[in-house]
Amino acid sequence: MKARIILIICLITGIAAHLSANEKIYINREVTTHIVMPENIKMVDISTTKIIGNQCTDNIVRIKPYLENDSISSEGYKENELLGTLTIIGERHIAQYDILYTESPKYASTIYNVSYNETQSYI
């Protein structure tokens, strides 16, 4: 009986961890990252003040790490530091991403195309 309870708890924990895991997008202060949704965007939520951005067209959002002064060195954020969560709500789907900082501009996404596999339908 104890073994069954432990097994059930492990399964529930594993499922919960899988469901809460977001895709990751890496950004850098020298690169503007454009996120392209496969449908028109209704709303964008940036969960923190460490990321700035705007919706530049019906289906594209652009983001960058926020630095109070451009003269601040990259030491302001650490490699792989989680800056926040980005939620994009489209006409029928929602996508959520963990935004991480990378010190190397070559590892930052310049254009990130959202696939329907990365979204959830809310209708």
Q: Model-flagged regions — what are they?
A:
Residues 4-14:
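Sec-dependent N-terminal signal peptides
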Residues 1:
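Glycine- and charge-rich intrinsically disordered segments
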